Amino acid sequence: GIRDLVRSRGLEMCIRDREMIVVCKPEDSAMWFDKLWQNTVDLFRSMDIPVRTIECCSGDLADLKVKSYDVEAWSPRQKKYFEVGSCSNLGDAQARRLKIRVKSKDKGNYFAHTLNNTVVAPPRMLIAFLENNLCADGSVKIPEVLRKYMGGIDRIVPNDNK
């Protein structure tokens, strides 16, 4: 069951993340950061998973990062939040290393800004989904947003045939 699935802590840390990458003009960097972060938050909330956002302090940022948010989902089993995604703005640091430039007639050549967002880490999303939609009878509630992909069913019911 879910307890056995979650108990194998390796599942939480499987690295099969789905990243969103943006290369943009410096003046669009803040707007893209907000969009990327909101994509992750909206995805989890659409599945009835409570999330919060932690802004990483400058001392915790990796070398190239200018700004970073961690998105955390609530774990009813552990009674705490755990990280399910991360959104980072690297400013022009990564573009400088990779020599990614923008050509502009007005401003000449300048370095682009790069951003990345771990929008989905499937194992961690599965844990958050199951824990937050598990019912007392052992069934799993299907959030409204997923029902059209599930043939309209609103619950997954355990099979009692053993």
Where is each model-derived feature located?
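Single conserved hydrophobic/aromatic residue that forms the stacking wall/gate
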Residues: 1-15
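TRNA-recognition modules of translation machinery and tRNA-sensing kinases, especially anticodon-binding
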Residues: 12-162
